[in-house]
Amino acid sequence: MEELFFELKQKVYEKLDINLDVSDEDLYKVIDVCIYEISQHRGLSVHNRELLRQQLYNSIKRLDILQELLEDDDITEIMINGYKDIFIEKKGRITKWNKQFESREKLEDIAQRIAAMSNKTINEAIPIVDTRLADGSRVNMVLSPIAIDGPVITIRKFYDTPIDIDRLIELGSITKEAADFLELLVKCRYNIFVSGGTGSGKTTFLNALSNFIPKDERVITIEDSAELQIQGVGNLVRLEVRKSNMECDNEVSIRDLIRSSLRMRPDRIIVGETRGEEALDMLQAMGTGHDGSLSTGHSNSSKDMLTRLRTMVLMGIDMPAEAIDRQIASAIDIIVHLKRMRDKTRKVWEITEVCGYKNNEFELVPLYKYVEEGEDKNGKIIGTLKRQNNSLKNTEKLEWSKDTGTMQCKS
């Protein structure tokens, strides 16, 4: 089949005017003619004809063998390490795919196609590009000479229907009790930071939290690459950074967007990921009347997240460390730390209240902690997110409801 595919592909190119932007309909007509001609003296089943038809179309007009992976809803991440080595993450497991691109040049061509989809350029002069596909999937591409063994393309897929908190409860990522607690905090405008390592599900969890925001609020989202899918908020402004290119320095950074958003009369600001000097602007926004703001960051623990935020602030301004720490403690109310477990599942590892800064240390109070109890026969981790013997100290935004017998947002 492989030799036949390349033979057919050559015949299709011979019949096409390669300088012409051929329509899908015309391309399929040429492909069908070529398949018919070759099937006259080769036995081809209907299944194989249809398979070759789609493979040829994908190779010429779409993203070649990548298209098959992009259309598989069970695949969450695609990792291409040169044209021969393709790895996929499917249902939490990373495996090597049994297919490869026909050549290094073909993979480079695919990288060019992906970049062109969003009017970007990738070449030896600009060997690193971050972009996204039409469906919103996030793409990072690196070409030689930076990528020694050939083009590296990493795709994190995007789903039309975002995972909500109910689905996270079903998956065992969080308990119903903890989810209800976080829903109350979001609605009552607590500033929440979601932390965790790479692949721990920070963006997914941030999106789930965002859907607790009251629908009558004005929300500004700021992202490096637009991924959030906030449902039901009509007064929503989505902002995305713009990186500089070779022609001119026209970069618009997250820091620029945070500063601009403050003049847009936001009720809340959501920053997809805080990872640089924009941390100071985010903290100032949280601490100056934009309660209920949300963001994420890379860290190994709740405490580590606060330390990393200090380092981020110092990237943009020279300030005493203690002054920065006090501002962090004043701005952030809650940290939700996520963890990707050894069985590849994602869990809320701890929910921690930031109560202040005293004696050169952050005052952190654990409210929920994941307690591991063992493994089942398949290696799946058994455990639960347990409420700790600590009450929420900052209750200024809450009041007791006599009608429901529960806490509610202060009116």
Show where each model-derived region lies.
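N-terminal accessory targeting/assembly segments
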Residues: 1-122, 133
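Conserved, well-folded catalytic cores of nucleic-acid-processing
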Residues: 11-18, 37-41, 59-69, 81, ...
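P-loop NTP-binding catalytic core
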Residues: 72, 85-188
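Switch/coupling sub-region of P-loop NTPases
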Residues: 189-192, 208-331, 337-339
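The conserved Walker
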Residues: 197-198
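Conserved lysine of the Walker
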Residues: 202
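NTP-binding/hydrolysis catalytic cores, primarily Walker-type P-loop NTPases
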Residues: 344-411
